[in-house]
């Protein structure tokens, strides 16, 4: 448990289930700590190795930290903004409020009200920034290049899986309509019969309300006679190794906040075909690292995947380009440093 006197940045996480926002926090905080940022989390659903405040320690927020005149409350959800506002305005704690917005939709009146009370706002993409009505800084997410990296060992290849074929094409994330899993499966049913060297894998959690959706996809695969070549893996213990096993990754989301999976795939030296949901179009260089199509357009998605399935060497070449692109533009340290600059602008000068 960190000493509240040493904590200058509080990153609340008020959601128990794993989400894209939670994943961002989990990846960012260790990197921020390595950069010397004095940050701690608050809330459930985070790994035990992250510095985590107890709720009772919030009483210590009335006193500024040892080196600064105030702290930064870095919210990423509405409820986290609301708590920050209460702590500052109701209890008069010396806090500066920061919000990171990934949403790509018109905000509700309530969300707009919350955002207007922030001292600074970060947008995770130009597209998400276009929905904000307040000044903001665009800082795109990065990826941990130490965790997501190209194949290094035999276990990183398709042979280690025991699956048929020479190449894997994958779609990862929760299995649901919003994520476009059905569009991927439909494309695989159309393309794989002509290309026996490829096998497709779907990995991700199926929540209770989406079981019928997943069961329908599995039934479609069986009806197509492809149950040995389109596999549903469920949740796997380590998704990173599966990225390394892929020759092509597909991100077919109909709707997305930011969307980290293309970065994770490209960092693993894997070409990517994606919809234009989330920030995907800002991450992928069409014709060099992959391809981007309109969200919800299953036919366009299939057409974009087809050249890679027909020519695996093209996928390999674009995977090499993707790795260089991510290393040059999307290292996690780059994101952490940019956020650190926003923190410093809010914290002000050190206490004398």
Curated annotation (Swiss-Prot):
Keywords per UniProt: Glycosyltransferase, Lipopolysaccharide biosynthesis, Transferase
Biological process annotations from GO: lipopolysaccharide core region biosynthetic process
Pathway: Bacterial outer membrane biogenesis; LPS core biosynthesis
GO molecular function, one term: glycosyltransferase activity
Enzyme class: transferase
Protein's job: Acts at transfer of mannose group to a 3-deoxy-D-mono octulonic acid (KDO) via an alpha-1,5 linkage.
Name of this chain's protein: Lipopolysaccharide core biosynthesis mannosyltransferase LpcC
Organism, as annotated: Rhizobium leguminosarum bv. viciae
């Amino acid at each position: 448990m960190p000493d509240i006197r040493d904590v200058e940045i509080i990153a609340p996480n008020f959601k128990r289930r794993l989400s894209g926002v939670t994943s961002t926090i989990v990846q960012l905080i260790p990197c921020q700590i390595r950069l010397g940022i004095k940050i701690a989390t608050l809330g459930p659903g985070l790994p035990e190795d992250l510095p985590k405040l107890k709720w009772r320690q919030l009483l210590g927020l009335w006193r500024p930290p040892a080196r600064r005149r105030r702290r930064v409350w870095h919210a990423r959800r509405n409820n986290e903004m609301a708590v920050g506002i209460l702590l500052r305005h109701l209890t008069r704690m010396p806090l500066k409020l920061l919000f990171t917005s990934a949403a790509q939709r018109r905000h509700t009146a309530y969300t707009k009200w919350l955002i207007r009370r922030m001292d600074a706002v970060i947008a995770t993409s130009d597209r998400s920034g276009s929905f904000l009505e307040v000044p903001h800084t665009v800082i795109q997410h990065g990826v941990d290049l130490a965790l997501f990296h190209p194949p290094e060992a035999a276990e990183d290849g398709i042979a280690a899986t025991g699956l048929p074929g020479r190449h894997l094409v994958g779609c990862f994330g929760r299995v649901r309509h919003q994520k476009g899993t059905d569009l991927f499966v439909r494309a695989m049913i159309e393309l794989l019969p002509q290309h026996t060297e490829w096998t497709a894998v779907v990995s991700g959690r199926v929540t209770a309300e989406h079981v019928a959706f997943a069961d329908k996809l599995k039934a479609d695969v069986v009806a197509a006679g492809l149950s040995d070549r389109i596999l549903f893996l469920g949740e796997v213990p380590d998704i990173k190794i599966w990225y390394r096993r892929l020759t092509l990754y597909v991100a077919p989301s109909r709707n997305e906040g930011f969307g980290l999976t293309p970065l994770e795939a490209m960092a693993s030296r894997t070409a990517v075909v994606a919809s234009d949901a989330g920030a995907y179009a800002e991450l992928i260089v069409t014709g060099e690292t992959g391809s981007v199509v309109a969200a919800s357009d299953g036919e366009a998605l299939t057409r974009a995947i087809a050249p890679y399935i027909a020519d695996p060497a093209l996928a390999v070449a674009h995977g090499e380009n993707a790795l260089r692109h991510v290393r040059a533009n999307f290292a996690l340290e780059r994101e952490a440093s940019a956020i650190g600059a926003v923190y410093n602008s809010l914290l002000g000068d050190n206490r004398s």
